[in-house]
């Protein structure tokens, strides 16, 4: 039996505040890969929170656990030859680097925009709700976002 050599997968991790374009870019990259017959998946932070991480809150420990869960799925998919595009706020550099080390084949894409632009976009009304005090621990308003010191790409 003649077996083809397995393809190497990779994780492209899109990090940045809400509204910075992470999911849009992840979907575009995955579609481009699929058009080239490369197996690809998108893991969107909002979708994962509603399923795999249902029940987690927004404390530091819960945010870290959410990111680790997504990282574990990315590592599994990458190991099986899938190009995985993860769109996750992932506000803490320590956990992002932990995920990078665990996956190996990993690119970090930092998506950024000025806060005024993010607040003007606000497709889910989250910045407005955070400013009104209706949302607590909102990244970029009353919870920190640690800018990656050395992303592979910054957009």
Locations of the language-model features?
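Glycine-rich phosphate-binding loop used to anchor ATP phosphates in small-molecule kinases
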Residues: 51-53, 59-109, 127-130, 134-140
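Short beta-strand-centered segment that lines the nucleotide-binding/catalytic pocket of NTP-utilizing
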Residues: 34-51
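Extreme N-terminal, non-catalytic leader segments
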Residues: 1-12, 36-39
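Hydrophobic positions on the alpha1 helix immediately C-terminal to the Walker A/P-loop
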Residues: 25
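Conserved lysine of the Walker
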Residues: 22
């Amino acid at each position: 039996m003649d077996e083809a050599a397995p393809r190497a997968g990779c994780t492209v991790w899109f990090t940045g505040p809400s509204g910075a374009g992470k999911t849009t870019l992840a979907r575009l990259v995955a579609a481009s890969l699929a058009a080239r017959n490369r197996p690809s998946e998108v893991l969107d932070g909002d979708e994962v929170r509603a399923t795999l991480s249902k029940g987690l809150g927004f404390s530091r420990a819960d945010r870290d656990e959410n990111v680790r869960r997504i990282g574990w799925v990315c590592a599994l998919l990458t190991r099986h030859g899938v190009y995985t595009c993860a769109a996750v706020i992932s506000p803490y550099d320590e956990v992002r680097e932990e995920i990078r080390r665990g996956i190996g084949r990993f690119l970090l894409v930092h998506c950024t925009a000025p806060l005024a632009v993010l607040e003007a976009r606000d497709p889910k009304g989250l910045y407005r709700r955070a400013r009104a005090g209706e949302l607590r621990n909102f990244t970029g308003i009353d919870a920190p976002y640690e800018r990656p010191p050395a992303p592979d790409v910054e957009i």
